[in-house]
C-alpha cells in the first residue's frame, strides 16, 4: 500500500501507517515489557510447577496432531480440497470496489439540456428546493447552480462549471432517514422533473467515480461513436440492475453555424478573428471594464439587445466594423445556417470518447453488474471498425488500477519478505514451506465473506494480504520451535508433535486477540469486510 502510486493508495495509506506503528509497538512490548512482567508475576515455587502440557486438553490435542501426522496424505488432501473450495467460494462472493458511506447525506444532481441558460437551471433548482424543504427526514441542505459543491470530503466527484447543471447536498436526520429520503427523491425526480436528467444517490467512499457502471466507446468519428454508443446503451439498459442509462454527450441540439467567405472578408479588410470577436461580443457579450462596489469588482459587459440576436435573420444583420471604419452586415461576408450537432464532445488521450453511464439499483454491487454486461458486448466489439474500441470504466477500472499500483510494488515487498525469512530460517526448504502456507488464508476468507454476506472489495483484499502475513508469522514461530527441538537432539517426529502442542496456545491467543480487535470494525461499512 505504501508504494502504490494511485488515488486508491493515497486513500488507504492510513492502513499501512497504523499497522506498521502497531506492529513496531507490539514488538517492543513483546521483547521488553512482557519478559519483565512474566518474571515479576510468575514466582518460583517450592517443588516446582506442574506440567502444563499434560492436562486433559493437551493430551487430546496431542492425539489429534499425532493422528494428522500418521495420516499425512489424508491431511494434505483435505487441506488441498478446502483450499479449492475457498477458491471456488471467492468466485461466488460479491465484488465491490468501495461501498457507499454511512454519512447521513444525499447528493442530488440535475442536468438540463445542453445550452440551457443559468436562469432556467436556477428555476428548476428552486422547484426542487421547495420540495426538499418539506421532507420530514431532511435536517438541512444546500444547493449549487452552475457548478457542484466544494470538495468537502475526499470521495466527492468534482463537477465542471456548466450553466445547465445544479447539485444539492442534503443532510438528513439519521441514516434510516437518508434511506427513506433517497427513495422519495428518486420518485419525485422521475415524476415531476421528467424533462431533466436527475439522480439522487448516497455519498460514496473511495476514489471519486462519477457513475457505478461506465462503458467507454472510443474512435475517430463522432457520428459513428454516437451510433455505437446507442447500441451499448441498449445492452446496458436491458440489464435489470441498472437505472438511468445515458451517454455523457447528451442529445443533439440546434446550433448556428457561420461560414466566412474568406475572399469577401479580405476584400473589405476583415479577418476571421475580427468577425469571430464581433459576433461573440454581440451574442455572448464582451467585458469592456469593471465596476467597483465596496469590496467587489463587477464586470461591465457590452452585448447586443435581444431583438438583434434572437433569430437567424437578426444575426445575419449584425454590423461588423471594418478596418476602414465602415460597417457591413454579417451576411455580406458569411453564410449563416442552423444545424443539429453534438452539444459537447469529450476526449480521452485526444481521442473522441463517448461514455455510456448508469446507476445501479440498491442491494447490488457495481462491479458485478459491469461483469454481467461486459460479455454481452462481445457482438458489438466483434463488429467494430478499425481504430474503434469499447473499454470498461467506473469502479471496475479503478479497482484494476488500484491492484496494478499495488502489484507494481509487490516485487520489492516479496524480496524483502524472502530476505527476512532466509535470515530467520537459514534454509530454502523452510522458507518455501512458510510461503506455501500464506494462500491457505483463502479458506477462511471465502467462508467468512459468504457466511456474513459481505462483499470482497479493495479493503477486504488488503485484509486478505494481511491475513497471509499473519499465517506466515505463525508458521515461522512453529518452524523455529521445531528447529530448536531438533538442535537439542529431539527425534524429528516428537519434535514436530511437541512443538505444535507447545506453540498452540500462543498462536491461538494472538489470533484471538486479532479477532477481538476486529469486532468493533465488523459493523463499519468500509472496514467490515476486512474485519
Model-found features: residue ranges?
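Transmembrane alpha-helices and their membrane-interface boundaries in multi-pass membrane transporters
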Residues: 1-3, 10-49, 168, 440, ...
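Transmembrane helices with small-residue packing motifs
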Residues: 2-11, 80-116, 152, 197, ...
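Interfacial helix-loop-helix hairpins and adjacent transmembrane helices
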Residues: 3, 7-13, 32-80, 114-120, ...
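Signature of alpha-helical transmembrane segments and their immediate interfacial
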Residues: 50-99, 138-139, 143, 215, ...
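Extracytoplasmic/periplasmic membrane-proximal domains and adjacent transmembrane bundles
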Residues: 226, 233-413, 419-425, 431, ...
Amino acid at each position: 500500500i505504501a508504494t502504490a502510486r494511485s488515488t486508491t493508495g493515497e486513500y488507504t495509506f492510513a492502513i499501512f501507517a497504523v499497522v506498521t506503528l502497531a506492529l513496531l509497538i507490539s514488538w517492543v512490548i513483546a521483547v521488553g515489557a512482557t519478559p519483565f512482567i512474566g518474571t515479576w508475576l510468575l514466582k518460583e515455587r517450592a517443588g516446582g510447577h506442574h506440567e502444563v502440557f499434560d492436562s486433559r486438553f493437551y493430551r487430546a490435542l496431542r492425539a489429534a496432531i499425532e493422528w494428522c501426522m500418521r495420516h499425512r496424505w489424508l491431511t494434505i488432501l483435505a487441506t488441498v480440497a478446502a483450499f479449492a473450495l475457498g477458491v471456488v467460494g471467492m468466485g461466488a462472493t460479491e465484488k465491490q470496489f468501495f461501498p457507499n458511506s454511512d454519512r447521513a447525506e444525499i447528493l442530488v444532481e440535475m442536468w438540463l439540456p445542453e445550452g440551457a441558460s443559468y436562469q432556467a437551471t436556477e428555476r428548476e433548482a428552486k422547484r426542487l428546493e421547495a420540495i426538499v424543504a418539506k421532507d420530514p427526514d431532511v435536517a438541512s441542505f444546500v444547493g449549487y447552480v452552475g457548478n457542484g459543491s466544494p470538495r468537502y470530503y475526499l470521495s466527492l466527484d468534482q463537477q465542471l462549471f456548466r450553466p445547465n447543471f445544479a447539485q444539492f447536498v442534503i443532510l438528513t436526520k439519521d441514516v434510516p432517514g437518508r434511506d427513506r429520503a433517497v427513495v422519495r427523491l428518486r420518485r419525485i425526480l422521475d415524476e415531476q422533473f421528467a424533462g431533466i436528467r436527475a439522480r439522487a444517490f448516497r455519498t460514496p467512499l473511495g476514489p471519486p467515480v462519477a457513475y457505478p457502471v461506465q462503458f467507454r466507446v472510443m474512435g475517430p468519428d463522432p457520428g459513428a461513436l454516437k451510433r455505437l454508443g446507442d447500441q451499448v446503451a441498449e445492452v446496458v439498459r436491458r440489464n435489470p440492475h441498472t437505472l438511468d442509462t445515458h451517454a455523457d454527450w447528451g442529445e443533439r441540439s440546434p446550433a448556428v453555424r457561420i461560414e466566412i467567405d474568406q475572399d469577401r472578408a479580405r476584400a473589405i479588410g476583415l479577418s476571421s478573428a475580427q468577425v469571430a470577436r464581433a459576433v461573440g461580443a454581440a451574442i455572448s457579450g464582451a467585458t469592456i471594464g469593471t465596476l467597483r462596489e465596496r469590496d467587489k469588482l463587477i464586470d461591465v459587459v457590452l452585448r447586443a439587445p435581444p431583438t438583434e440576436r434572437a433569430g437567424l435573420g437578426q444575426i445575419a444583420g449584425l454590423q461588423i466594423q471594418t478596418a476602414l471604419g465602415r460597417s457591413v452586415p454579417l451576411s455580406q461576408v458569411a453564410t449563416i445556417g442552423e444545424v443539429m450537432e453534438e452539444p459537447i464532445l469529450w476526449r480521452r488521450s485526444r481521442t473522441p470518447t463517448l461514455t455510456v453511464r448508469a446507476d445501479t439499483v440498491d442491494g447490488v454491487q457495481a462491479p458485478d453488474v459491469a461483469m454481467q454486461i461486459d460479455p454481452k458486448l462481445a457482438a458489438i466489439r466483434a463488429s467494430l471498425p478499425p481504430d474503434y474500441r469499447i473499454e470498461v470504466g467506473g469502479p471496475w477500472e479503478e479497482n484494476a488500477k488500484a491492484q496494478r499500483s499495488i502489484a507494481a510494488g509487490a516485487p520489492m515487498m516479496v524480496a524483502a519478505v524472502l530476505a527476512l525469512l532466509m535470515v530467520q530460517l537459514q534454509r530454502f526448504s523452510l522458507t518455501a514451506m512458510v510461503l506455501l502456507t500464506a494462500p491457505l488464508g483463502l479458506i477462511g476468507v471465502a467462508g467468512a465473506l459468504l457466511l456474513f454476506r459481505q462483499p470482497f472489495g479493495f479493503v477486504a483484499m488488503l485484509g486478505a494480504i494481511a491475513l497471509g502475513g499473519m499465517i506466515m508469522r505463525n508458521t515461522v514461530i512453529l518452524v523455529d520451535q521445531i528447529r530448536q527441538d531438533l538442535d537439542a537432539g529431539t527425534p524429528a517426529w516428537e519434535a514436530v508433535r511437541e512443538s505444535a502442542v507447545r506453540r498452540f496456545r500462543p498462536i491461538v491467543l494472538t489470533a484471538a486477540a486479532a479477532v477481538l480487535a476486529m469486532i468493533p470494525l465488523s459493523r463499519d461499512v468500509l472496514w467490515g469486510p476486512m474485519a
